[in-house]
Structures are given as structure tokens and as C-alpha cells.
Amino acid sequence: MAEYTKAVVDGRPCFHISLVVDVSPNCDCHGENDVPILPNIGMFASFDPLALDQACVDACLSATPIPGSQLANNLARPDFEDHHDHFRNSTPESEWRSCLEHAEKIGLGTRSYELVVMK
């Protein structure tokens, strides 16, 4: 995914916007998807697509899961191994970190950012 993004944005002026709403346990393309696991987090924007993704992830990881969601139910189970990562706790086989690491390695952007909150 990182290579495709780099091919599209490399050498072109771009501004990226992400709306972090109705964060579901699986990709929206999955037919078996469940109710959102996280509340609406907000809107993020950056000239750096990787910094944008990292800011969105960090905001999600610090959010409280929606009660009754797959994530909240997983965390409530006494035998559940908490990975301290909402995405892995929802979908243990998730390897989202490797995509961001690879994107930084190929020069798509930086995972460092300064968050400016606007209200």
C-alpha cells in the first residue's frame, strides 16, 4: 500500500485529509463488518501523508472503545490478552505498524508530527 501511495504523490503537491469516524473492526469492504469500535475521533489534515496516518492512529489508540463493541467486549473477557493496541485487540492478525514503518523507510514521509487542535 505504501508503494502505491508513493507512486501517486511523489513529486506532486498534495494536501491530505482524513476523517476518523465510525472506526470499524475490519476494513469497510468486509461484508461481515461489525459496529464501530471507536467513537468519532475527528478530522485530520497534513501535507505529509505518513504524519497524517500516524496522528490518526495515535488518536485512535488513545480513545476509549465504544461500550458493547467487539473491541470493548474483547477487553472485558478475563482470558483476553491485551496488546495495548486497539487494532490488534480487535483483529490480532493486524500488522498495521509494518505499513507505516515501510512507508517511512521508502521516503513517503515521516511519522513525526505536531498536532494542532482547532475547535
Language-model-detected regions and their locations in the chain:
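Extended, low-polarity segments enriched in aliphatic/aromatic residues
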Residues: M1-K119
